[in-house]
């Protein structure tokens, strides 16, 4: 599943194709994705101008002008799931694919939603597994919607700090890795970047969340921010399932210190340890037991 850096990369790729432009036609080829699409989905979007695209955790938020004068903005919430893929076809017919396809082709069979923009741009959403979803929410109700209400702070936002993280870890007996994957703790973190952040902070994934003292929390907060910023700058991580909206592969996976490196020597100078893989909550955890305490 794409994590925060990959979703942010897709948002940045879609923004030039959508922002400031009106949707002139929506093709809806099935009534549902992971969940049923909203009632009158295509009709409610047709004719609306896109104001801006934002990201919250692993969701892309498309803000649209009000349907009626004086009304509230509607927000299209999009989640890519495991296999969602956007492809942007320019007015000239050129294509800039934004892939989340696990190495499988899209093709019209899996092209479920098509947005035609006023300048001739066509944005196609394909999803062969249909684990992604879309929803429409009035802007005043966005923060309290079922998708966003329980989310923790954005790790790259001003509301995220060592003090905030320490408060959210207080009294929790779960392993620190499990606590960080809980979207109520910090929004948008996934398996890859939690492994990498814990490594940079020198914290064992087996340590209980409540045992992370102030100095470690400071290091962890800084490591989370740094790992995410580095990954976004690299265009995300290409494993089997990701390329950016311009078709370029993300390359942060080449900078992985521990993820996917079981049995390799720790890259930290003077450590001498070996990267180990364990399973926590049915997910692979990669860490160096010699320098992560």
Swiss-Prot record:
Catalysis: reaction(s): Hydrolysis of DNA containing ring-opened 7-methylguanine residues, releasing 2,6-diamino-4-hydroxy-5-(N-methyl)formamidopyrimidine; 2'-deoxyribonucleotide-(2'-deoxyribose 5'-phosphate)-2'-deoxyribonucleotide-DNA = a 3'-end 2'-deoxyribonucleotide-(2,3-dehydro-2,3-deoxyribose 5'-phosphate)-DNA + a 5'-end 5'-phospho-2'-deoxyribonucleoside-DNA + H(+)
Cofactor note: Binds 1 zinc ion per subunit.
Needed cofactors: Zn(2+)
Keyword terms, alphabetized: DNA damage, DNA repair, DNA-binding, Glycosidase, Hydrolase, Lyase, Metal-binding, Multifunctional enzyme, Zinc, Zinc-finger
Binding site for DNA: 110, 129, 172
Self-association and partners: Monomer.
Its job: Involved in base excision repair of DNA damaged by oxidation or by mutagenic agents. Acts as a DNA glycosylase that recognizes and removes damaged bases. Has a preference for oxidized purines, such as 7,8-dihydro-8-oxoguanine (8-oxoG). Has AP (apurinic/apyrimidinic) lyase activity and introduces nicks in the DNA strand. Cleaves the DNA backbone by beta-delta elimination to generate a single-strand break at the site of the removed base with both 3'- and 5'-phosphates.
NCBIfam families: fpg, PRK01103.1
Protein known as: Formamidopyrimidine-DNA glycosylase
Name of the gene this protein is made from: mutM
């Amino acid at each position: 599943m794409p994590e925060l850096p990959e979703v942010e990369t897709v948002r940045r790729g879609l923004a030039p194709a959508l922002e400031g432009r009106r949707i002139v036609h929506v093709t809806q080829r099935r009534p549902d994705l992971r969940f049923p699409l909203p009632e009158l989905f295509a009709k409610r979007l047709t004719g609306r101008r896109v104001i801006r695209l934002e990201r919250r955790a692993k969701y892309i938020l498309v803000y649209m002008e009000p349907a009626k004068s004086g009304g509230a903005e509607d927000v299209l919430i999009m989640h890519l799931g495991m296999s969602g893929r956007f492809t942007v076809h320019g007015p000239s017919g050129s294509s800039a694919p934004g892939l989340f396809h696990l190495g499988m082709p899209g093709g019209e069979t899996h092209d479920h939603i098509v947005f035609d923009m006023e300048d001739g741009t066509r944005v196609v959403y394909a999803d062969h597994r249909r684990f992604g979803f879309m929803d429409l929410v009035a802007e005043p109700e966005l923060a309290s919607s079922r998708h966003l209400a329980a989310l923790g702070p954005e790790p790259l936002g001003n509301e995220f700090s060592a003090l905030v993280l320490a408060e959210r870890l207080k009294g929790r007996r779960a392993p620190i890795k499990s606590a960080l994957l809980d979207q109520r703790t910090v929004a948008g973190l996934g398996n890859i970047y939690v492994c990498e952040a814990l490594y940079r902070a020198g914290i064992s994934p087996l340590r209980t969340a409540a045992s992370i003292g102030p100095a470690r929390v400071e290091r962890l907060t800084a490591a989370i921010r740094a790992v995410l910023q580095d990954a976004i700058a690299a265009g995300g991580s290409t494993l089997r399932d990701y390329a950016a909206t311009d078709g370029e592969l993300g390359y942060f996976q080449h900078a992985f210190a521990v993820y996917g490196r079981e049995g390799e020597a720790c890259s930290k100078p003077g450590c001498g340890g070996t990267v180990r893989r364990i399973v926590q909550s049915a997910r692979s955890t990669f860490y160096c037991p010699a320098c992560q305490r």
